[in-house]
Amino acid sequence: MFSRDVRLETYDPELAKAIAAEAGRQEDHVELIASENYCSPLVMEAQGSQLTNKYAEGYPGKRYYGGCEFVDIAEQLAIDRIKQVFGADYANVQPHSGSQANQAVYLALLQPGDTILGMSLAHGGHLTHGAKVNVSGKLFYAVQYGVNEQGLIDYDEVQRLATEHKPKMVVAGFSAYSQKIDWARFRAIADSVGAYLFVDMAHIAGLVAAGVYPSPMEHAHVVTSTTHKTLRGPRGGIIVAKGASEELQKKLQSIVFPGIQGGPLMHVIAAKAVAFKEALEPAFKTYQQQVVKNAQAMANTLIARGYKIVSGGTENHLMLVDMIGRDVSGKDAEAALGKAHITVNKNSVPNDPRSPFVTSGLRLGTPAITTRGYQEQDSIDLANWIADVLDAPTDEAVLAKVRDAVTAQCKRYPVYG
């Protein structure tokens, strides 16, 4: 049915009700999933535009369809802006996701069966860094490094594994690691065995853009990221590089299209362009600085309440709460906090005795609450409420008290109003 007059709530009330309920949940629940954020109304306006109708296989100026003169402008804006954000001289903004951006890098630079060296999912890495259940661990021989007893990346172990296995690619980046990474050390390790250094900065891209976390651009052969998370754009992916050879750039271009994707999502690329412009604003740096301040305030409060944070604290936007030895599991903690309107995700911790479906950890992140306007004291209050729930996860009176406090806090900091 095509109509300019009928509204969604009239035509499809079931779907409209679900969308409205989710909008309400985002307003009255506090979002602490480290990979989630709230994109701006401007980003959503671009993503909901007529550009969703346009097919545009190819790249700006080299399309396989007519009528691309305006979407070419949108994509070129996104390319130029993300280059400026990260100081890159190559950028591809077409990947539909971070996982597809990673897949593109692997397929552009490796052959099936080649060895890759990446961070273990169980120690804070990502599925796409060589996990056996992921295509990256099926197409390639994946060797995994981890963290030491202090919860820090063991660079000596990474070097030892690289020397032993001679990977074609070293993968650096994470989904649950709260300290800074020594990109120069990783590059030295990769160079010592003649490997590519590939950095997945999906979680920290916004922090890198604002200069509050070390940039991998001077060290990596190629870098990928999502465009949501700390970058606060639409869901999608990018590939960027600095100093990449013309041959490497051609490989990356051709593997994204026509290698693994067909038509790009032009409405999403337009939304990316808006987000990249926002990332160039002075306010974006202030925001990212506050993200880290809020994370550190939360981590310090949880430590003071007797909870262990993997690596002893955080230097970015996230922290991993280690509950090994406690009666409450990550799964149960996630459910209890959800009842109190605090949204988190269970997460495995290093040497976790529980299964990945249960876990002994929680991953917490501050990008979304900082977008709402939370400051350090708000984060301290929130961390204390989290500890209250974790101390008594089955006490309905505690859950109700925390839920009321969280609801009141959320009302002080509306997302979209």
From Swiss-Prot:
It comes from Xanthomonas euvesicatoria pv. vesicatoria (strain 85-10). The modification N6-(pyridoxal phosphate)lysine is found at residue 229. Pathway: One-carbon metabolism; tetrahydrofolate interconversion; Amino-acid biosynthesis; glycine biosynthesis; glycine from L-serine: step 1/1. Its cofactor is pyridoxal 5'-phosphate. Its EC number is 2.1.2.1. Belongs to the SHMT family. Gene3D superfamilies: Aspartate Aminotransferase, domain 1, Type I PLP-dependent aspartate aminotransferase-like (Major domain). One of its GO terms (molecular function) is glycine hydroxymethyltransferase activity. GO terms for biological process: glycine biosynthetic process from serine; tetrahydrofolate interconversion. The record marks 228 as: Plays an important role in substrate specificity. It comes from the Bacteria. The gene is glyA. It catalyses: (6R)-5,10-methylene-5,6,7,8-tetrahydrofolate + glycine + H2O = (6S)-5,6,7,8-tetrahydrofolate + L-serine. Catalyzes the reversible interconversion of serine and glycine with tetrahydrofolate (THF) serving as the one-carbon carrier. This reaction serves as the major source of one-carbon groups required for the biosynthesis of purines, thymidylate, methionine, and other important biomolecules. Also exhibits THF-independent aldolase activity toward beta-hydroxyamino acids, producing glycine and aldehydes, via a retro-aldol mechanism. GO terms for cellular component: cytosol. CDD domains: SHMT. It is found in: Cytoplasm. The keyword Nuclease does not apply. (6S)-5,6,7,8-tetrahydrofolate binds at residues 121, 125-127, 355-357. Homodimer. InterPro entries: PyrdxlP-dep_Trfase (IPR015424), PyrdxlP-dep_Trfase_major (IPR015421), PyrdxlP-dep_Trfase_small (IPR015422), Ser_HO-MeTrfase (IPR001085), Ser_HO-MeTrfase-like (IPR049943), Ser_HO-MeTrfase_PLP_BS (IPR019798), SHMT-like_dom (IPR039429). This is Serine hydroxymethyltransferase.
